[in-house]
Amino acid sequence: MNILVIGRGGREHAIAKKLQREDKVKTVYCAPGNPGMSGDNIRTVPISEEQQTELIQFAKDNQIDWTFVGPETPLIEGIVDAFQAAGLLIFGPTKAAAIIEGSKSFAKDFMQKYQIPTAEYRVFRRLAPALEYIEQQGVPIVIKADGLAAGKGVVVAETKTAAKRALVAMMEDQQFGASGQTVVIEEFLQGEEFSLMAFVSNEKVYPMVIAQDHKRIFDGDAGPNTGGMGAYTPVPQIPEEAVQQAISQVLKPTAKGMVAEKRPFQGILYAGLIQTATGPKVIEFNARFGDPETQVVLARLESPLSEIISSLLVKEQPTIAWNELASVGVVVAAEGYPNQYKTNLPLPEMSGETIYYAGVTRSEQALVSAGGRIFLAEATASTLEEARKKVYQTLDNYSFPGMYYRKDIGVKGLI
């Protein structure tokens, strides 16, 4: 079969690479992809994610059997609806269903309605009452831009000054444009975070193995939030009982609730969870694979991804098997990220390693950096300790000036 993957990051590289290795897959195209993907026989297509008409035409012209959407923005802009209207098979939620990620206020109200465990919250559309609420509630407190903000729209404020500064930046200074005109303010939850993703087809939920990602830029979870600096799986400090609880109290009622709301969800549902004293609670929902969690979770998927998605697209039950291995992925970023950083850093040739490229471009035949997060190095082994050793050994061998990465990815799992 011929498959089109939409997106350009490390997540899409991992999805495309997984598909490319499977027996029933003939060609994997990635639009627009990135130059780092071509070494894996993935054909990149110079059409960007928002060019719906051109993508539909490409799918028709190239006998694409089905399309997979990686990033959130095209989903929220209705790419699935457009493909379906053109009579094409595509795996991902419609615009109506992708709102679970596109609007945090929708997601919070939805969770309240369907009794899905989450933090206490209030939604504000005006600055003055939001500032007043901070005065009443005290800190620490969490402030979230309602719409998409590339993973950077959440502030955990330790002081009232920081909380107010975040509100002014979002609501008055338009830091995230329209995304920050409405904000959600919620209680700060204490506990261990984990990511639980699932293949979803209307009310049917097929959970994946859990992972833990590292959002902060510095070791020890210090510094500002990023798009993610690394991930690992399994997460031994999260008991199996908590995972089962999250499946029954979060994923299943969410899938059912979306059907009840006439927003049936088909695609990848991602629950960002925190294990509290009273069980798992939802921090956020995403309507797609997480990045960097995908790069480690797919390393543990034994069944062909192409067959799972092909089954779901025709409403058949897929066969899904996971291995017992451990996987650790470490993001290499440009020094200074997520603030000011240099681009055009020359990258070393990396052969035989599992590297998923993100912010890269080609300059005179060589790969150079073109973004904050440049690539993710992944290693799989029988234990987390071994996988950590392997991945950091790779990074030691391939160091280059201007690179930065966290040294503690997966340490929390070494219990």
Predicted regions and their residues:
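Active-site "cap" helix and flanking loop/linker of ATP-utilizing ligase/carboxylase catalytic domains
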Residues: 247-269, 286-344, 350-352
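General beta-strand structural signal in soluble alpha/beta enzymes
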Residues: 30-31, 68-69, 90-93, 120-123, ...
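Internal nucleotide-binding/catalytic subdomain
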Residues: 157-290
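ATP-binding N-terminal substructure of ATP-dependent carboxylate-amine bond-forming enzymes
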Residues: 1-95
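Active-site nucleotide/adenylate-binding loops and adjacent lid/helix of ATP-dependent enzymes
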Residues: 4-5, 102-182, 212, 236, ...
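Peripheral (often C-terminal) accessory segments that flank ATP-dependent C-N-forming ligase machineries
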Residues: 310-415
